[in-house]
Regions:
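N-terminal Rossmann-like dinucleotide-binding module
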Residues: 364-423
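Conserved acidic E/D residue at the C-terminus of a beta-strand in Rossmann-like folds
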Residues: 196-197, 280, 412-417
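C-terminal capping/lid region of NAD(P)-dependent oxidoreductase domains
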Residues: 4, 188, 223, 255-258, ...
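Mid-domain Rossmann-like dinucleotide-binding core that forms the NAD(H)/NADP(H) cofactor-binding site
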Residues: 115, 141-213
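Helix N-cap at the beta1-alpha1 junction of Rossmann-like dinucleotide-binding domains, i.e.
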Residues: 198-201, 261, 417-419
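A glycine-/small-residue-rich N-terminal strand-loop-strand element
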Residues: 77-90, 95-119
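Short N-terminal strand-loop motif that marks the start
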Residues: 1-88, 120, 353, 357-371
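Glycine-rich cofactor phosphate-binding loops and adjacent beta1-alpha1 units
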Residues: 206-277
């Protein structure tokens, strides 16, 4: 299958041919129909993959980690950490939809042929835990359903704002997630003001402004009527949080969804008794192994809106036409052309969103075949087969074995993950 990845020290994403992943007991294998490019997160991944040693030294935490490693494991370990011999490429993408073509033995709620959304990457096939999938309702656009994971990020941030019918919300940053927050808040009956310096993102909306001062001058907001500020911008500047504290009313809530610094002024929060919340991705369950790997759900009476229930809620809004996303899709392109699109997000005329379209091919053959393999002729080397090619095996064990090529020979590697098996 084909998968979009970013390699270390290569600023242009590439498409790799990798084995189709094998779903685990709590996973489903999905043939992707569409996936949505999340420019902010994915460009950050590309930038991270291309950081030089000098760039990394700018982060004081890396220096501390290096000194600790030097004390514990010596100079060789530090050199290996800075200049690794074998580094897995980064997968891109996390909001897609497609069709279930195989289900793990513990999966009860999904069956072959189901149309589902997932947080799968930009790849022809993805293996995803059942708690990170949701069935697409009938009469729902699959193309719009592909936005569900991004929509759930927006929905979780909105839930954390504790706003209700009639609340006034200011959304700072009108990229994909910011636009989704605005639409969800309006569907909830809130009054929404959007702010983004990119004029193209504020056109055709009377309640969108290129600066907060424009909104104040237009008398859309003042420091007494803003119930919540949701920051969906990505910035290295402290300006978003400073603006939020300036415009929020007393006892208002500020929710940070985007990647921004939080150099906050205590006095700004003290005198207004402001509440600051940093939103974690799609909602409760995120990064919890029990939920995302082992497939254990949270009881609804204790956790009403898990990430999976957020997926379902967003899909229901699409099905009932309470929100529509067709006008948010700037471009739709074939997946095979995906490597060329990222430079568009760096241009002055950057698109709001791009949807990748996958070719609907015949089903792959997923059954294992038993093959007779003749014993290799002896050359005095120890023959090794590796089962499991995770991060530790790929970055530590396999490089060591390569250094021992006079003594041993790796004749095969098996892994449930297509990308790690290819590496």
């Amino acid at each position: 299958m084909k998968q979009l990845v970013v390699e270390r020290n290569n600023p242009v994403p590439v498409i790799w041919d990798t084995p189709i992943p094998q779903p685990g007991p709590n996973e489903v294998l999905i043939k992707n129909y569409y996936s949505v490019v999340s420019s902010g997160t994915e460009l950050a991944s590309i930038e991270s993959a291309n950081k030089t040693v000098t760039d990394k030294l700018q982060d004081s935490s890396n220096i501390s980690k290096g000194l600790d490693l030097l004390k514990k494991e010596g100079l060789g370990a530090v050199i290996e950490a800075v200049f690794p011999k074998n580094v897995l490429p980064l997968q891109l993408g996390y909001s897609s939809c497609g069709e279930v073509i195989q289900a793990g033995k513990n999966v009860k709620d999904f069956h072959v042929g189901d149309k589902v959304v997932s947080n799968g990457s930009h790849a022809e096939y993805v293996a995803v835990n059942q708690n990170l999938c949701s069935r697409i309702p009938d009469d729902t656009s699959e193309k719009e359903a592909a936005f569900t994971v991004l929509g759930s990020i927006a929905l979780h941030g909105l839930r954390l704002s504790d706003t209700t019918l009639g609340s006034k919300i200011v959304v700072i940053g009108l990229g994909i997630v910011g636009q989704l927050v605005c639409r969800l808040a309006e569907a909830q009956g809130c009054e929404v003001i959007g702010v983004d310096p990119d004029e193209k993102r504020t056109l055709d909306r009377n309640n969108f402004y290129t600066s907060i001062d424009d909104a104040i001058n237009d008398k859309s907001i003042n420091s007494e009527n803003v119930d919540a500020v949701i920051i969906t911008a990505a910035s290295s500047s402290n300006e978003p949080i400073e603006v939020a504290t300036r415009i929020a009313r007393n006892k208002a809530k500020i929710v940070v969804v985007g990647d921004i610094p939080l150099n906050i002024s205590r006095n700004d929060f003290y005198y207004k008794e402001l509440e600051l919340v940093v939103s974690k991705s799609y909602g409760p369950g995120r990064y919890d192994k029990q939920y995302e790997v082992l497939g254990n759900d949270y009881p609804i009476e204790h956790v009403r809106w898990t990430e999976n229930r957020n997926f379902s809620a967003f899909l229901q809004l699409l099905q009932t036409n309470q929100i529509s996303l067709s006008d948010m899709i700037t471009e739709e392109i074939d997946f095979i052309d995906a490597p060329s699109i990222y430079e568009k997000f760096e241009s002055d005329d950057k698109p709001l969103s791009i949807v990748l379209r996958y070719e609907l091919t015949n089903e792959p053959k997923l059954d294992f075949e038993k093959t007779d393999i003749s014993t290799p002729s002896s050359n005095g080397k120890i023959k090794l087969g590796i089962i499991g090619a995770g991060n530790f095996a790929s970055t530590t064990i396999l490089p060591i074995l390569r250094d021992l090529k006079r003594e041993c020979e790796v004749i095969g590697v098996a892994s449930s993950g297509g990308l790690s098996a290819e590496v």
